[in-house]
Amino acid sequence: CDGPLQYVIWRKMLKSISPAPAVLTLDPESAHPNLILSKDLTSVTERESPQVVPRSPRRFLQSVNVLATASFESGQHYWEVWVGNKTKWELGVASDNVDRAARVRLCPDNGYWTIRLWNNSEYWAAATPWVRLRPQCLLRKVGVLLDCNAKKLTFYNAEEMSHLFTFHQLWASKFYPFFSTGFSHGEKNAEPMRICHPLRH
């Protein structure tokens, strides 16, 4: 997987996005009790037993999910997520009014627009119906571009900036970056997910 020219062009385009790409952090009050966040709130790891955490209406209780602290209502926003060698993960955006206490299917009808790695080898867009993704190589870093004004969400392989999938007609008024580690199943999926800050030097 190599696309240096495409990568350079994309990086130049990022500078024109307004507002500029935000530095995201994870929201501890939204994190499922099995999730451990790093001190700088940029990475998340799942543990097999829950922690004792304060009650919060923002907290996910049934699935190992966490949201970013920031939400977006207008403009374009880009961020990258390092998934490395994880065997299972899901990421994208969620609407501000998703049901966090119940186990629901992550799909646009329920306020989620995501892609996922399933069974260590299958990439899917959680559309209706699901769409199988066939990237040219394993995804280790995923780029997410949210265009609130156009109601559009696009995913890229951030290591070579190839297009993965685009959701259209997003219907929420406010969007939160969304992350789900998947259960670790011992050591197989223990690697953390990490928010990257692509324009930080």
List each model region and its residues.
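Beta-rich ligand-recognition domains in immune and ubiquitin systems
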Residues: 1-201
